[in-house]
Curated annotation (Swiss-Prot):
Description of what induces expression: Induced by UV irradiation.
SUPFAM superfamilies linked to this entry: Terpenoid cyclases/Protein prenyltransferases (SSF48239), Terpenoid synthases (SSF48576)
Organism domain of life: Eukaryota
Family listed: Belongs to the terpene synthase family.
GO biological process: defense response; diterpenoid biosynthetic process
Taxonomic classification: Eukaryota, Viridiplantae, Streptophyta, Embryophyta, Tracheophyta
Protein's recorded name: 9-beta-pimara-7,15-diene synthase, chloroplastic
């Protein structure tokens, strides 16, 4: 059986993976290696912490016999391509600074486009204590309308083209009514009415997207305009068609007495006719900040019809902040910031803004702890905040989501009444971030939200829309079943630069999204270049160690690299990724050696050589195969150990050797069981199989290159041991379920068959698999809990590698068809490395 990364390496392109287990705790090291100072000076010109790369590893003289060249070079002029790529990347980063600066500005202080529609309604609010026809309370809004009419006579946001839309028609009509109310801007009114007349057919075209409540608000505003004496530029037939739209909508809503309908009517109250609105009922939805749903338009309409100190105070706060440029929603900082944080993570560039993201999450956590309305009462904000806070180690309880545990709560909200897919998707994603078995609220929330999303996939409401792809992707790939490079590529290729929040009118600027897409595409392209150069380096290493000449082993170098890249994706972690890939390749060689390429005597001979290590010349080579395998192992482990020792400022090579020795001994035990037909107990099986899972030889060495000091007390800590245990257990059990049928045919046992045997055949195979899947889920939650907790001793970047490894294991051991199958996943990983991005602009 293969490790999760071996599963990639095996794939369907080669023979099926054999039984391989996982590792255990590796001890730390002690004294610094003698070559550390020289390497440190070469890379840093002094005594600073070194960045060691494979470019100089050949120079690291370990004091041991030098074996055949490992393909490393000493001078930067002849360094491997991926090291040159790192230097190029440093220059490329200067080009990206403009994008990063603009993204950072929006991240820290979200930009809101002025909303002509909301500005118009705020402009209609009269000065308190005066006759309604005497003076506006917010003259700056009236002035903005006068100064910001487009050349075609319209008002409204239209960043992409000059064509009309229902949103622009609604905004234009609102601005006309505001100017007419204060008897100003006759020329602007004339031009605005001409624009509406020219584009009136759009209003009744049901194929054109409409803002929320358009079929109620636009007809009501047409009636208001006519009552104000405006000569509305439409025929009586056209007016009747508009009113028919309103009547049809009211008929559809007539029998609905739900709280959701009440919330919906309150949300669009500014556009409803007077006879349809009970303002005392509407004001029940007023928030602590005085607003209705954080909507300036709805709040202004309430003030027009019914004076309220808190509502007026809210509008003053909006105008004081934005002047006449009132946005559609305020406040929206937290939602906007969290949305951008989520986007940065999804498209793979969050590491460029880590400190800024932490400040935002710190602020969000404070608001969460205070149960602030801006976070808790807005469903998508609440769900997104919970997910991001929990995944970043903040102590948020699922009990805080009790108000959205039931589907009825969702349906009684504005978002639920509007059947808002984005809000529903956020609730579903939040439900999956479970850290224990006792979180019934998340379980309930995931059940009903998942069912509703599946129903949406079967309907025509969102077919062909970008949100449909998001829903399909989220349902098919939970966050623990995705690989970072694949996830980043999918999100970049499906990025919609025109996307904006589903609200009454357009509000969010697109240029920020364009900057995000540009930076992500540039970052991903550089990753690809780095990956390609790393593969060339690995091919040279394979030839120089003569691994390609071994007849008993399968050719798995590229696949070994793909599995390493799936687990360690950032281009700046080249050394960790290369170390991991080389180690995977060697574990596959050892796997095949013990499985099909050696006798018992050869296996014992190889173990004896590794036990002697530097004194290997005291042991004779039993065969050329033993010699070839040992020399490849000896050369590479020493090389990696020397580099890791330079980075860690102490000798860590011997601990990597010990992990290899543990691995080889467990392979020998497995081989002996096969030869003797021994049936181990479940306890014996798991104890051995978690070592042959190959986590020890492949992961610890990579962890040394993650930019963190892994002192001896860290790698001997119980937390470290538990991370290994949980990851090994998950991977072993996932492997066993996937490989059960094949191993039965080969006469081999694994945890599934042993569980059935232990039950004396009372338990069926399917029941055994179900029980094991429950164990996997439990281990996964516990693993995630350890990874995200902030009070541990293991550095965060190192813990995250365990989580990425779990995701690699989960994906490649999935039994699902299509994209989740190893064959499809291998094709997708190849696409990550070799195929250019297919963005909307391409």
């Amino acid at each position: 059986m293969a490790s999760p990364m071996e599963a990639v390496a095996r794939s369907s392109l080669v023979l099926a993976p054999r039984r391989r287990r996982a590792l255990g705790l590796l001890p730390a090291a002690a004294a610094a290696a003698p070559f550390v100072l020289d390497c440190r000076r070469r890379h840093n010109g002094g005594m600073r912490r070194p960045h060691v790369s494979f470019a100089c590893s050949a120079e690291l003289d370990t004091g041991r016999r030098q074996l055949p060249s490992t393909g490393t070079r000493a001078v930067m002029s002849s360094c491997p391509g991926y090291v040159e790529g790192r230097m190029v990347g440093e220059n490329t980063s200067q080009i990206n600074m403009g994008w990063e600066a603009r993204i950072l500005r929006h991240l820290e202080n979200p930009e809101f486009l002025p909303s002509s529609y909301d500005i118009a309604w705020v402009a209609m609010v009269p000065l308190p204590g005066t006759d309604h026809l005497q003076a506006p309370c917010f003259p700056e809004c009236v002035e903005w309308i006068l100064q910001n009419q487009h050349s075609n006579g319209s008002w409204g946001v239209n960043e992409f083209d000059s064509s009309a839309s229902k949103d622009i028609l609604l905004s234009t009509l609102a601005c006309i009514i505001a100017l007419e109310k204060w008897n100003v801007g006759s020329e602007q009114i004339r031009r605005g009415l001409h624009f509406i007349a020219k584009n009136f057919s759009i209003v009744i075209d049901d194929q054109i997207a409409a803002p929320i409540g358009f079929n109620l608000t636009f007809p009501a505003m047409v009636n208001l305009a006519i009552k104000m004496g405006l000569e509305f530029p439409a025929s009586e037939i056209s007016i009747d068609q508009i009113l028919h739209l309103r009547d049809m909508e009211l008929k559809r809503l007539a029998g609905d007495e739900s709280l959701g309908k009440e919330a919906y009517f309150a949300y669009i109250a500014e556009g409803l006719e007077e006879s349809m609105v009970d303002w005392s009922e509407v004001m029940k939805f007023q928030g602590k900040n005085g607003s209705l749903f954080n909507s300036p338009a709805a709040t202004a309409a309430a003030l027009v019809h019914r004076y309220d100190d808190k509502a007026l105070g809210y509008l003053y706060s909006v105008v004081n902040k934005f002047g006449g440029e009132v946005p559609t929603v305020y406040p929206l900082n937290i939602f906007s910031q969290l949305s951008m944080v989520d986007t940065l993570v999804n498209i793979g560039i969050s590491r460029h803004f880590s400190s800024d993201i932490k400040r935002i999450l710190d602020k969000t956590y404070i608001l969460w702890s205070q149960r602030d309305e801006e976070v808790m009462l807005d469903l998508p904000t609440c769900a997104m905040a919970f997910r991001l806070l929990r995944m970043n180690g903040y102590g948020v309880s699922s009990d805080d989501l009790s108000h959205v545990a039931e589907a009825s709560t969702f349906h009684n909200s504005v978002e639920g009444y509007l059947d808002d897919t984005k809000s529903l998707l956020e609730l579903y994603k939040a439900s999956k971030v479970s850290l224990s078995e006792n979180e019934p609220i998340l379980e309930k929330m995931g059940c009903w939200s998942g069912s509703l999303l599946k129903e949406k996939l079967c309907s025509d409401d969102i077919r062909g829309t970008p949100i449909l792809r998001e829903v399909e992707y989220a349902l098919k790939f939970p966050f623990y079943a995705t690989l970072e490079p694949l996830d980043h590529k999918w999100n970049i290729e499906n990025f919609d630069a025109r996307a904006y929040q589903k609200i009454k009118t357009k509000n969010m600027p697109c240029h920020v999204n364009e900057d995000l897409l540009a930076l992500a595409a540039e970052d991903f392209s550089f990753c690809q270049s780095t990956y390609q150069n790393e593969i060339q380096h690995l091919e040279s290493w394979e030839k120089e160690n003569k691994l390609d000449q071994l007849e008993f082993t399968r050719k798995n170098l590229i696949n070994s690299y793909l599995s390493a890249a799936a687990t360690i994706s950032p281009y700046e972690l080249s050394d960790a990724r290369i170390a991991c890939a080389k180690s995977i390749a060697l574990t596959l060689v050892a796997d095949d050696f013990f499985d099909v390429g050696s006798s018992k005597e050869e296996q014992e001979n190889l173990i004896s050589l590794v036990e002697k290590w530097d004194q290997y010349h005291k042991v004779e080579f039993y065969s050329e195969n033993v010699k070839a395998v040992f020399f490849a192992l000896y050369s590479t482990v020493n090389q990696l150990g020397a580099m890791a020792s330079a980075v860690q400022n102490r000798d860590v090579t011997k601990y990597n050797v010990e992990s290899w020795l543990d691995y080889l001994r467990s392979l020998a035990t497995d081989a002996e069981w096969q030869r003797s037909k021994y049936v181990p107990t479940m306890e014996e099986y798991m104890k051995n199989s978690i070592v042959t899972f190959a986590l020890g030889p492949t992961i610890l060495i990579a962890l040394y290159f993650m930019g963190q000091n892994l002192w001896e007390d860290i790698v001997k800590n119980a937390e470290y041991d538990e991370l290994f245990r949980l990851m090994n257990t998950c991977g072993r059990l996932q492997n066993d379920i996937q490989s059960f049928e094949r191993e039965c045919k080969d006469g081999k046992l694994n945890s599934v068959s042993l569980l059935v045997l232990d039950s004396k055949d009372v338990m069926s195979v399917e029941e055994a698999k179900e029980a094991i899947n429950e164990s996997i889920s439990s281990c996964r939650r516990e693993l995630l809990r350890l990874v995200v907790r902030e009070d541990g001793v293991i550095p965060k970047s190192c813990k995250e590698m365990f989580w990425n490894l779990y995701k690699t294991s989960h994906v490649f051991y999935s039994q699902a068809d299509g994209f989740s199958s190893p064959k499809e996943m291998m094709g997708a990983m190849n696409g990550v490395i070799f195929e250019p991005l297919k963005t909307r602009g391409n």
